[in-house]
Amino acid sequence: DLDYTTAITLILVGIVGGMVIAAIGSGGAFVPTPAMITLGAPGIVAVASHICHKFPKALVGAIKRNKYGQVDVKLGLVLGVFAEAGVLFGKHVMTDIKNSFGAVGTDLYVSAMFVVTLAIVGGFVFKDYRKLKALDDAGNGEEQAAPLTKLARWVQSVKIPGTMIYSKGAQAELSVLFLVPIGFATGFLASAIAVGGFIGVPAMIYILGLPAIMASATELVIAFIMGLGGTIFYGLEGVVDIRLAMLILLGSLFGVQLGAIGTTYVKDYQVKFTMAVIML
């Protein structure tokens, strides 16, 4: 049941989630999704409702950060197309679990995937933050450009005719063949446990070679596309609670404005530190 206390709690949760999605591009799923489960919503309803509220705030955040020149629109659109395929596959996995094991099964699935994903990605990002912080300190307070990983240099060096697109964020041509698995994995996690940005953002940084600021902003474009498709897919299953989605959206639209403004005052390594701390 939805009372006044629960409604206010969801709005506050939305504010925090909105700040996170604008700041680090992760969608902040680890905030509203567990909160909805804690308040009694089944795992599949929590994930579906989060996806429903995600695409409007992602659009707002993308437009806001594009004004600051932080969004690689072309890359975001291409990754978003492949992510939509992952969304559809993830939805089928979730509904199969629901049909086989009920609400308890979806709760366990969401919780287990959260723990594994956040631990692995968070640890990797925190390690990279320490390297960037050391470079920044060595530069006497002036922000140093993040060095490309060996993998990113290799990906940017591969030229496959007929598959290349120019990425403003990476300032290099990238093969679409490398974007397929990144987009699909991002979409799968977004649809299964609503945390696609935890794969998409680090992948754009460490595999494609985008700066953290641009990767987190570009993820908002992907989140919009995934959220729109996911809402339709889950809506057809009848598991979207529009009340939960709208209350969280109400708070997140305010929070996303604060988060977007905040990114103009932080350094690249500070974005990665925030990502790592929140994940872990």
Role assignments for model-derived ranges:
Residues 6, 42-55, 216-220, 238-252:
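Structural signature of hydrophobic alpha-helical transmembrane segments
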Residues 58-61, 118-121, 125, 223-230, ...:
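Helical transmembrane-bundle signal
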